[in-house]
């Protein structure tokens, strides 16, 4: 019910959602490709391992810039990695190559992920899984023998490389699973799950406390991520004795270097495996625990750290090569620290959003054992969480809007209309004035919040003049607001966004005491329903909205708008023929569900027309 979606598959900004896209200038691009990128790509084929290594590291850094990444992808970066580097004689290069593929999969989402999958990347992953299991087993056996002297530099480096390799492979699996639902479904097959479990089990046998914290977090991330997508995966884990024991005792105390990401992931795993069995008290404690884990992260400083990378130029001599390597290592260390903080906040927001959804599901479930939501949780939801969301709103806008959306709808379900007037006013100002900057996810999230807020502020479709919060938001008979939503609908072609615009307009139109605003919305709906080439989903949504808005003659806007505006004759003479024609074009075989919705809508429209005709004759 409350499965926490860690990130959207439509989003290609997991690795660095804060970085702005680079500029696009064809002449500059040609110059950059010829003078900067091609030499690096050519060095990937150099016979000198050090040249290949420096080139690969430099390319990895460049790929963090969206524009540079696109240029490199156009120059066939992925095929070069697959064909030349995954089987390189230098182990460091192989390990880093898988890491770069992971980054590209996270950044580019579907396109790169599906290309890798169709190029049989899973075979490379599993063959290296086998090597990792063997190496871990040998390492564990060697460490159990009496050590006459401390491990040498080569052994320490070999162990580091092994752990980095496991980290990159497991995180690549996570990246691929997030790139495509088809890939996810294949990864979740029993045979592939068992291959993944073999690696994780060997890591646990080696000793959690001896693993680098990054690898431990990656292991937790994989469990959290796949459990957020599949109940079957949870069953697989629960049926695995070693993994089940590990999760039963899972706590930050297991690892001496546990950080904010460790703590958030552990809470996330607990939430996924408890799901609807979770109590209200556990929900409350989990929210506070997650927020406490990220409390010391400054989102403003985090943005500055991520958006201001160092410039790493090409090496011109042996001494320069050494300096470049040092620069790259320093940069990677700082970047890794920033990305841990970034991912911690991302997952924390998603987890809180999922917990809110679970609370709503439990409250609405007739099978729930808990009748009332305790006062402590109510206080967390109404006072604590809004403060947290407001702190993070400017940096993690898209995610926070989803969190706000869930929280406001929960307020609606709980009939929590007596919220702080200051909170309502501040939140309304934020979502209505938010600059989406052509980010579709922000536009959809913003419109969803506006819809939920209207439901919260006007629960019965009535304006209460003594309510200062309603006066402060200046929403009574605001035709300009209605026109703004209509423009948003007309200027965008995304179905989900358009549907949310209709929901906002429909809810606003039903508020009595504002004839002008209702007229603006009613005429827009009626005119749209007479137009050709409107998607059937939109026609259905608008028609159903008309049923709700004008379903009762007692509404103060019914007589001046619906009756005197001649809506009934327009419905009979123009809308019915248009909908009949448009709905006929929906293929029953290709889209049976939509066809059924069209049929239901048309049938209801016929009944609605007859109802309004009888209503008018009765009132005359």
Swiss-Prot record:
GO terms for cellular component: cytoplasm; nucleus. It comes from Saccharomyces cerevisiae (strain ATCC 204508 / S288c) (Baker's yeast). GO terms for molecular function: unfolded protein binding. One of its GO terms (biological process) is protein import into nucleus. This is Synchronized import protein 1. Coiled coil: none annotated. ARM repeats lie at residues 25-64, 66-106, 181-221, 258-299, 340-386, 435-470, 471-510, 564-607. Forms a heterotrimeric complex with RPL5 and RPL11A or RPL11B; interaction of this complex with KAP104 allows the nuclear import of the heterotrimer. Component of a hexameric 5S RNP precursor complex, composed of 5S RNA, RRS1, RPF2, RPL5, RPL11A/RPL11B and SYO1; this complex acts as a precursor for ribosome assembly. Belongs to the nuclear import and ribosome assembly adapter family. It comes from the Eukaryota. Present with 2600 molecules/cell in log phase SD medium. Residues 1-32 are annotated as: Disordered. It is found in: Cytoplasm; Nucleus. Keywords: Cytoplasm, Nucleus, Protein transport, Repeat, Ribosome biogenesis, Transport. Nuclear import adapter that specifically recruits the two functionally and topologically linked ribosomal proteins RPL5 and RPL11 (encoded by RPL11A and RPL11B). Guarantees that this cargo pair remains bound together from the time of synthesis in the cytoplasm until delivery to the nascent 5S rRNA in the nucleus. Gene3D superfamilies: Leucine-rich Repeat Variant.
């Amino acid at each position: 019910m409350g499965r926490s979606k860690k990130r959207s598959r439509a989003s290609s900004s997991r690795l660095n959602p804060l970085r702005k896209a680079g500029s696009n200038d064809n002449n500059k691009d040609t110059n950059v490709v010829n003078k900067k990128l091609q030499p690096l790509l050519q060095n990937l084929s150099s016979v000198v391992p050090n040249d290949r290594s420096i080139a690969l590291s430099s390319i990895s850094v460049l790929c963090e810039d969206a524009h540079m990444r696109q240029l490199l992808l156009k120059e066939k970066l992925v095929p070069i990695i697959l064909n030349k580097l995954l089987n390189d004689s230098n182990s460091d290069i192989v390990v880093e190559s898988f890491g770069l593929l992971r980054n590209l999969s996270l950044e580019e989402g579907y396109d790169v992920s599906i290309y890798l999958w169709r190029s049989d990347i899973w075979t490379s992953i599993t063959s290296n899984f086998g090597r990792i299991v063997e190496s871990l087993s040998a390492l564990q056996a060697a460490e159990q023998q009496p050590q006459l002297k401390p491990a040498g530099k080569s052994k320490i480096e070999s162990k580091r490389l092994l752990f980095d390799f496991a980290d990159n492979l497991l995180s690549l699996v996570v990246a691929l699973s997030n790139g495509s639902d088809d890939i996810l479904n294949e990864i979740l097959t029993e045979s592939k799950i068992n291959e993944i479990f073999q690696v994780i089990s060997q890591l646990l046998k080696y000793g959690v406390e001896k693993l680098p914290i990054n690898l431990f977090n990656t292991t937790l991330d994989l469990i959290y991520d796949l459990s957020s997508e599949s109940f079957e995966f949870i069953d697989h884990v629960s049926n695995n004795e070693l993994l089940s024991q590990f999760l039963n005792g899972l706590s930050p105390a297991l690892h001496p270097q546990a950080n904010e990401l460790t703590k958030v992931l552990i809470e996330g795993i607990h939430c996924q495996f408890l799901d609807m069995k979770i109590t209200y008290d556990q929900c409350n404690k989990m929210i506070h625990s997650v927020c406490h884990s990220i409390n010391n992260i400054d989102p403003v400083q985090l943005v500055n750290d991520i958006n201001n990378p160092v410039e790493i130029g090409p090496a011109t001599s042996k001494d320069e090569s050494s300096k470049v390597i040092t620069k790259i290592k320093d940069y990677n260390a700082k970047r890794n620290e920033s990305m841990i903080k970034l991912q911690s906040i991302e997952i924390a927001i998603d987890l809180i959003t999922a917990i809110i959804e679970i609370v709503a599901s439990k409250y609405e479930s007739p099978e729930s054992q808990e009748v009332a939501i305790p006062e402590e949780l109510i206080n967390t939801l109404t006072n604590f969480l809004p403060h947290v969301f407001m702190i993070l709103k400017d940096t993690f806008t898209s995610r926070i809007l989803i969190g706000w959306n869930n929280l406001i709808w929960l307020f609606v379900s709980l009939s929590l209309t007596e919220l702080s007037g200051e909170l309502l006013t501040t939140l309304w100002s934020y979502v209505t004035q938010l600059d989406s900057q052509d980010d579709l996810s922000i536009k959809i999230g913003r419109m969803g919040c506006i819809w939920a807020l209207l439901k919260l502020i006007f629960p019965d479709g009535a304006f209460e003049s003594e309510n200062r919060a309603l006066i402060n938001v200046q929403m009574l008979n605001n035709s300009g607001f209605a026109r703004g939503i209509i423009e948003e609908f007309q200027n965008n072609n995304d179905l989900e966004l358009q549907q949310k615009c209709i929901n906002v307009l429909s809810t606003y139109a039903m508020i009595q005491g504002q004839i002008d605003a209702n007229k603006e919305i009613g005429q827009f709906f009626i005119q749209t329903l007479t137009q050709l080439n409107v998607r059937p989903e939109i026609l259905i949504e608008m028609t159903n909205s008309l049923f709700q808005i004008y379903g009762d003659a007692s509404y103060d806007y019914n007589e001046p708008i619906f009756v005197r505006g001649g809506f009934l004759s327009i419905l009979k003479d123009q809308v019915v023929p248009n909908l009949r024609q448009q709905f006929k074009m929906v293929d029953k075989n290709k889209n049976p569900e939509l066809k059924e919705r069209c049929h239901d809508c048309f049938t209801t429209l016929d009944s609605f027309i007859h109802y309004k005709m009888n209503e008018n004759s009765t009132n005359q």
